[in-house]
């Protein structure tokens, strides 16, 4: 039996990727949580959510996509119901973020997924590490992300030195999720 090749990682502009393949992987990964009604995303929804200037992280092994994530300037993700530091009012989406806002100037990381059969083998950590290195290299002061408590990833990110800057509890049906869920906005200085 031959050894498997090590995974390779590359970052490409969103318009240079097969969004069908990427959104299918995200859907398989998110399906493991069993809290979504239907699919997490579609190619069109992925593009709309990520934005035209987003870049996509692709982790491949022997020609097969096994991990992915999306990065873009965090200011793009300033929807009033989505973000704001704990205990403060939400920013006006038309206004730029205050310089002291935790997501101001940050690189946002989201829409991440790992092929279920290779989960817990370091692929996600490989992606997060690359995002952090890329943020430093490109002059971003921090990385921002959002996760649900129900995914069990808050403690994981805390171990990687991310800190929670806002939490919100949403009712079932919000974001096509079938249960009440807690959204955590987190940042890490890089």
Residue ranges and their predicted role:
Residues 31-78:
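Active-site rim helix/loop that mediates acceptor-substrate recognition in acyltransferases
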Residues 68-111, 169-179:
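Conserved acyl-donor/pantetheine-binding loop and adjacent beta-alpha core of acyl/acetyltransferases
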Residues 106-107, 135-148:
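Conserved GNAT acetyl-CoA-binding A-motif
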Residues 1-20, 24, 28, 188-190:
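Conserved N-terminal entry element of GNAT/NAT acetyltransferase domains
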Residues 114, 120-133, 159:
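Conserved acetyl-CoA-binding loop-helix of GNAT-fold acetyltransferases
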Residues 110, 115, 119, 148:
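Residue-level recognition of the GNAT/N-acetyltransferase active site
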Residues 144-146, 158, 163-180:
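Conserved catalytic-core motifs of GNAT/GCN5-like acyltransferases
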Residues 124, 128, 150-153, 169-177:
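Short glycine/proline-centered loop/turn elements that form peptide/ligand docking sites
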């Amino acid at each position: 039996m031959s050894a498997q090749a090590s995974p390779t990682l590359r970052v490409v502009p969103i318009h240079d990727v097969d969004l069908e393949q990427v959104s299918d992987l995200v859907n398989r990964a998110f399906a493991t949580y069993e809290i979504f009604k239907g699919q997490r995303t579609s190619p069109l929804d992925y593009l709309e959510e990520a934005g035209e200037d987003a870049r996509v992280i692709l982790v491949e092994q022997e020609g097969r996509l096994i991990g992915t994530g999306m990065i873009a300037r965090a200011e793009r993700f300033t929807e009033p119901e989505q973000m704001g530091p704990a205990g403060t009012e939400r920013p006006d989406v038309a206004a730029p973020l205050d310089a002291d806002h935790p997501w101001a100037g940050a690189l946002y990381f989201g829409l991440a997924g790992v092929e279920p059969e290779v989960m817990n083998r370091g692929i996600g950590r490989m992606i997060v590490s690359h995002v952090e290195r890329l943020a430093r290299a490109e002059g971003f002061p921090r990385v921002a992300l959002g996760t649900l408590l129900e995914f069990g990833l808050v403690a994981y990110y805390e171990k990687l030195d991310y800190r929670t800057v806002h939490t919100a509890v949403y009712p079932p049906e919000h974001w096509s999720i079938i249960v009440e869920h807690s959204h955590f906005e987190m940042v890490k200085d890089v």
